[in-house]
UniProtKB/Swiss-Prot annotation:
UreD, UreF and UreG form a complex that acts as a GTP-hydrolysis-dependent molecular chaperone, activating the urease apoprotein by helping to assemble the nickel containing metallocenter of UreC. The UreE protein probably delivers the nickel. It comes from Staphylococcus aureus (strain NCTC 8325 / PS 47). The keyword Heme does not apply. Belongs to the UreF family. HAMAP family: UreF. The lineage of its organism: Bacteria, Bacillati, Bacillota, Bacilli, Bacillales. Keywords: Chaperone, Cytoplasm, Nickel insertion. This is Urease accessory protein UreF. Pfam families: UreF.
């Protein structure tokens, strides 16, 4: 029997889903222009770093904390995490990019599902109390659909791996088959990252590799670009 609940959430993992992820490299393009990333092996090394740093200590841990807040109807906790996700994202392009993607995802989720939490989140943005973040929206959608937090995080990490790989295929460039081999190679690391997220303390929230942030900042000054961030 098909699990429609999981398929509904997995729809948001489609690299063609119109959240704008295809327009953002989150610093990857800077590494490519500096020739630090130039083939599948160097991209995999960067993708592992991105997965184990930004997606672990920022997005992933935020999702775990937000899910607990949803279970306890703690609206102030959700707003607090939303604020931290925005202000700790120091590079302007990635900060604005995450806000744009979060706004698109929230609006699309509202078009597709009648989720009280997502409707509330959107209203908080209109009241200038929230910025909207894709990781938080994805968590709210999964919670609304009755999906467990472990699966929600797995799907979100997969969505990021898939979309960043497709962007690398265009930018390095790589072949489509090479891109699919990379995604297959990364699946075990997704599970390991999720397990690490559940071992973290809340005090670990926001730890990010300085080199990643510096290259995200440097992207503002690249002369030729195909990505917004």
């Amino acid at each position: 029997m098909i699990d429609h609940t999981h398929l509904r959430l997995f729809q948001f993992c489609d690299s063609q889903f119109p959240t704008g992820a295809f327009s953002h490299s989150f610093g990857l393009e800077t590494y490519i222009q500096r020739n630090i990333i130039h083939d599948d092996h160097t991209f995999i090394a960067w993708l592992k770093m991105f997965l184990q740093e930004q997606l672990t200590y920022s997005d992933g841990l935020a999702m775990r904390l937000v899910y607990d807040a949803l279970e306890n109807d703690d609206t102030q906790k959700v707003l607090h995490i939303d604020k931290l996700m925005f202000v700790q994202n120091l590079p302007k392009e990635t900060r604005v990019g995450a806000k744009q993607m979060g706004t698109r995802m929230v609006k699309l989720a509202l078009e597709l599902y009648n989720s009280p939490w997502i409707a509330w989140y959107h209203q908080q943005m209109q009241d200038k109390k929230a910025k909207l973040n894709p990781a938080i929206c994805f968590t709210m959608l999964g919670h609304h659909l009755g999906v467990d937090i472990e699966t929600i995080i797995d799907y979100y990490l997969y969505q990021n791996v898939s979309s960043l790989t497709q962007n690398a295929v265009r930018a390095i460039p790589l072949g489509q088959t090479a891109g699919q081999k990379i995604v297959t190679h990364m699946i075990p690391y997704i599970e390991g990252t999720r397990k690490q997220i559940f071992e973290l303390k809340e005090a670990d929230f926001g730890m990010t590799a300085p080199g990643l942030e510096l290259n995200q900042m440097a992207h503002e000054n690249v002369n030729v670009r195909i990505f917004i961030s």
